[in-house]
A protein has these predicted regions:
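Conserved SAM/AdoMet-binding glycine-rich loop
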Residues: 1-85
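Flexible glycine/acidic-rich beta-alpha junction loops that bind and position SAM and/or redox cofactors
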Residues: 4, 58, 62-63, 92-100, ...
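Hydrophobic, Leu/Ile/Phe/Ala-enriched alpha-helical segments that form helix-helix packing faces
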Residues: 13, 109-113, 173
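Structural beta-sheet core signal
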Residues: 24, 88-90, 123
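Catalytic cores of alpha/beta
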Residues: 35-37, 95-112
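Short, hinge-like loop/turn segments at secondary-structure boundaries
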Residues: 40-41, 66-67, 105-107, 139-140
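Hydrophobic, well-ordered secondary-structure elements that form the walls
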Residues: 50, 88, 109, 121
Length: 173
């Protein structure tokens, strides 16, 4: 839910004097200011879910996510101050991600939890999907898309098998 849409929805809920509880998916965009988060809470928002992805600035930039860890953390603080529950989606095994970056991301996310900035999270293994920007520019991410074949792991029936060097994405979980 883009911040402008959220603002309009909240204003309409309040204008109509509706008594509702709701939650939505967001990007941890800087436009989620403390004032907007307070408005959301006043309009009945109890939770948001959003992607911190790999929780690493290098990878967020490579993914062209438009946020940094510092800017996302500022938004998380605004949600906390408004008493809005935050669930973060994360991923691991993103192309070019190192084991050291994974460990640092884990430490960082645990720190967000200790600070009360996120209340829950879930780590998903990276899946390359047909219509993703990564599938459109695989060389930018150091991957080779393998011939289309039935993937051992299927996500929305559009997952692509790929390899990084000689390592296939068809690993057993």
């Amino acid at each position: 839910m883009p911040p402008a849409v959220v603002r309009g929805m909240c204003e309409e809920i309040l204008r109509r004097k509706l008594k509702v509880e709701w939650w939505g998916n967001v990007r941890f965009d800087a436009a989620f200011t403390p004032a907007l988060c307070r408005l959301m809470a006043k309009a009945g928002c109890i939770a948001v879910t959003g992607g911190l992805e790999c929780a690493n600035d290098r990878l967020l930039k490579l993914m062209n996510k438009g946020v940094t860890l510092a800017s996302a953390e500022k938004v998380l603080k605004a949600f906390k101050a408004a008493k809005i529950f935050v669930h973060a989606y994360l991923m691991y095994d993103f192309p070019t991600e190192t084991k050291a970056e994974q460990k640092e991301a884990e430490r960082y996310v645990k720190g967000l939890g200790r600070k009360g900035l996120i209340q829950s999270c879930f780590w998903h293994r990276f899946a390359l999907t047909v219509h993703s920007p990564i599938a459109k520019e695989p060389e930018k991410f150091g991957i080779v898309i393998e011939r289309p074949r039935k993937s051992a792991r299927v996500f929305a029936r559009n997952e692509l098998a790929f390899r990084i060097g000689s390592q296939s994405s068809q690993r057993k979980c």
